A protein has these predicted regions:
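Short aromatic-enriched loop/helix-cap "lid" or pocket-rim segments at secondary-structure transitions
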Residues: 48-52, 142-144, 178-183
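Beta-strand-loop-alpha "switch" segments that mediate conformational coupling across diverse proteins
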Residues: 167-177
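Short, catalytically relevant binding-site loops at active-site mouths
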Residues: 92-94, 136-138, 175
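Residue-level signal for alpha-helical context at structural boundaries
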Residues: 34, 118-122, 147, 176, ...
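Short, flexible segments with low predicted structural confidence
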Residues: 75, 130, 179-181
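N-terminal beta1-alpha1-beta2 submodule of the flavodoxin-like/Rossmannoid cofactor-binding fold
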Residues: 1-116, 187-223
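Cofactor-binding loop segments of dinucleotide-utilizing enzymes, especially the Rossmann-like FAD-
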Residues: 8, 41, 132-134, 171
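Short, glycine-/small-residue-rich phosphate/pyrophosphate-handling segment
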Residues: 99, 111-169
Length: 223
């Protein structure tokens, strides 16, 4: 069983990465038959869809697959054949990181077929997914913003392509710097952030860990 944990943050040791690590641990703790592959997207040189449309060519050798040659060409094929995928991204302007958006374009666009008759989705398999969204703002800010609607568009298309409603984990009010005194950031209530980091973030990590275990259990139940 192969599960991917894909980090769309440029940092490998802050909130998004920590949550993904907990997801990976939850999955791996289910037994030696579970292989979790952690991918840091910022280690790869790639762009979003280049609109070459090789994935749409009639009788094309790359029909249904991204053919653009760069660092993720093979990775896209490997991820599409995974048993489960967790996508982790910090939130910028209520949306995914640019690297994560580019990766998802390349991963999912080839699997949407522009034809009248079914099937209009040609992904090689259905895959359960998890999204982990780490954001700097307090939860109250998201209640009056389009944040979840914007992120929900990605969840919608992921379900459309991979056939499962994604499980979504939101981590709010995350700790952004190692030393807040070095940065212009007095808009935030630092004591509140410290308290949230000490009391809520461990709960978020546990939720991510549980999501990893639940994904493996779901996959085993399907066999």
């Amino acid at each position: 069983m192969v599960i991917y944990a894909i980090n769309g943050s440029p940092r490998k040791n802050f909130s998004t990465a920590q949550l993904l690590q907990q997801f990976a641990k939850g999955a791996a703790d289910c037994g030696p038959d579970v292989e979790v592959r952690v991918i840091n997207l910022y280690d790869y040189n790639f762009s979003g869809c280049r609109e070459c449309f090789a994935c749409k060519l009639k009788d094309g050798k790359s029909y249904g697959w991204c053919a653009w040659p760069d660092d993720i060409t093979q990775l896209l094929k490997d991820v599409a054949m995974a048993d489960g995928i967790a996508f982790g991204s910090p939130v910028f302007f209520y949306d995914l990181s640019a690297q994560m958006k580019a990766f998802l374009e390349r991963l999912m666009f080839p699997f949407t077929a522009f034809k009248k008759d079914a099937p209009r989705v040609i992904a090689p398999k259905q895959i359960p997914t998890v999204f982990i969204h780490a954001m700097n703002v307090p939860v109250e800010r998201t209640l009056t913003s389009p944040c979840k609607d914007i992120l929900g568009n990605t969840h919608f298309w992921t379900k459309h392509v991979f056939g499962h409603q994604p499980q979504v984990i939101y981590a709010y009010n995350t700790w952004q710097y190692t030393d807040y005194d070095k940065y212009v950031a007095d808009i935030w209530d630092l004591e509140d952030k410290k308290n949230w980091k000490e009391t809520q973030f461990p709960i978020d990590c546990q939720q991510a860990y549980d999501a990893g275990k639940q994904m493996v259990e779901q996959l085993r139940a399907q066999k």
